Structure formats: structure tokens, C-alpha cells
């Protein structure tokens, strides 16, 4: 048993050393759920104080996957993280689905449950040393308003910077140019993005 403990300790030290020797553009080192607490402590806030939080939901999206609202913001976060020296928090895969909950595969979280959940996550990110919190939202409707409201509350109360980005707002002109229309839910906007991920 003692031998296993010593080998595990040596392996941990070796892997931790390898982590710091790696090129920081290596994506897995940007994902908070893929590093250990010692690596996290060495990175936040001394090397970065910015975090990307992908949010979405599970709901029908026509012919594409029910998790498209999660897939797109996470893929964007991986690209943005490399360019902005940010870490990526785990994707929040459940949201305020409302009108889609009658369809198979949809999951509805009420606003009354979602609002304090999001607030506690944002406060936890602040507590862990993040001063810049960027929410990359993959789902519209009431979820967008809740995210914006809670992010503003946390920014004021905790003296940090927050930003909510609805990625589809930036894709509107491109989808009009390529497809001749703006798209929308389960339309041209999410399908190409999720097809490229």
C-alpha cells in the first residue's frame, strides 16, 4: 500500500510539472474541470483572473442534437480562452427551457431555481479569484434576462466585471449573407455552428 502511495505521489508531481512546462495554448489546461486544485491555485489569480462560463440547455433543435445550446458556447469558449488567457468553467447544461418542455428530451429549470443557482456559481468564481467573468450564453428566452440580471447584481455586489454574450447576436449578419435569412431557433444559426464543432 505504501508503494502505491509513493508511486501515486511521484506521478502527481510529474504530471503537475508537465502541466507547467506545456504550451499554455494546450486547450485541456484551460478547462477548470480537467486540472487539479494545485494547478488551479498556481494559475488563478496570478496567471489569469478571467473565466468563461458557457451556458445552455437541453431542448429540441429540429434535426440537430438537443444539446446544441451547450455545444456551441463551449466550442467558442475553447477558442476564446486561448486568445484571452482565460480558463473555462464547466458548461451549465440545463436552463430555462419553458415553451419547449412538452417535447421529448427537453428539461425545464424554473427561474426560481435557476436564478440563485447561477448567482452562487458566479459568487463561487469570484471567491476563487476570478475578477472577469464572461458568460457565453447558448440559449435565449427568459434565460438571457436572468443571466444579465444576476451578472449585473454580482458585478455590483462583488466589485468584479461580468459580461453576458449571446453568441447568435454576432452570427446574424453572417447567416443572412450565407443563407439568405437570419435563422433562429433550430434554424440556420445553430446548425452550421454545431456542425463545425
Where are these regions (language model features)?
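Active-site and ligand/interface coordination hotspots across diverse enzymes
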Residues: 22-62
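Extracytoplasmic strand-loop-helix segments at the start of, or within, the mature domains
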Residues: 53-55, 60-81
Amino acid at each position: 500500500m505504501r508503494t502505491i502511495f509513493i508511486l501515486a505521489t511521484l506521478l502527481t508531481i510529474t504530471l503537475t510539472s508537465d502541466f507547467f512546462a506545456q504550451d499554455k495554448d494546450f486547450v485541456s489546461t484551460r478547462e477548470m474541470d480537467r486540472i487539479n486544485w494545485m494547478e488551479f491555485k498556481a494559475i488563478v489569480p496570478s496567471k489569469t483572473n478571467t473565466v468563461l462560463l458557457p451556458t445552455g440547455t437541453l431542448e429540441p433543435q429540429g434535426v440537430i442534437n438537443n444539446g446544441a445550446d451547450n455545444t456551441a458556447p463551449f466550442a467558442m469558449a475553447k477558442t476564446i480562452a486561448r486568445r484571452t488567457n482565460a480558463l473555462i468553467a464547466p458548461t451549465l447544461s440545463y436552463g430555462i427551457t419553458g415553451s419547449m418542455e412538452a417535447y421529448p428530451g427537453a428539461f425545464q429549470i424554473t427561474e426560481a431555481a435557476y436564478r440563485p443557482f447561477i448567482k452562487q456559481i458566479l459568487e463561487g468564481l469570484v471567491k476563487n479569484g476570478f475578477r472577469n467573468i464572461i458568460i457565453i450564453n447558448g440559449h435565449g428566452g427568459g434565460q438571457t434576462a436572468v443571466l444579465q440580471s444576476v451578472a449585473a447584481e454580482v458585478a455590483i455586489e462583488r466589485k468584479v466585471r461580468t459580461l453576458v454574450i449571446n453568441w447568435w447576436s454576432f452570427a446574424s449578419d453572417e447567416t443572412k449573407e450565407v443563407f439568405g435569412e437570419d435563422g433562429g431557433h433550430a434554424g440556420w444559426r445553430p446548425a452550421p455552428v454545431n456542425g463545425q464543432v
